[in-house]
Amino acid sequence: MTKYYLAVDIGASSGRLILGHLENGKMVLEEVHRFENGMVKKDGELCWEFDRLFVEIKDGLKKCKELGKIPVSMGVDTWGVDYVLLDEAGQVLGNTVGYRDHRTEGMDEEVYK
């Protein structure tokens, strides 16, 4: 039975889900889902659409199921500078503010003072 591995790559302008499996000792890759991405203004801040990104990942997982290629593992790669805070129940607290938001303007100069 073939083992499939899923990579979720979310970038600043697009995201994609790639399935991989070994064939004759080599990794074979297949893009199963691609979507546009970008920040939107929310409450005066530039934010990632967290809920929509989650839906896109689920859509990619559904596509894997439709193809009959269920991954045995999954890895997610996103930006190294953004984060969300979660409460005890795993719910997002506040907006998912992005690194390009105005709130960080001038901070690089402050670091070197």
What spans do the regions from the language model cover?
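N-terminal glycine/serine-rich phosphate-binding loop of ATP-dependent small-molecule kinases
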Residues: 1-95, 105-106
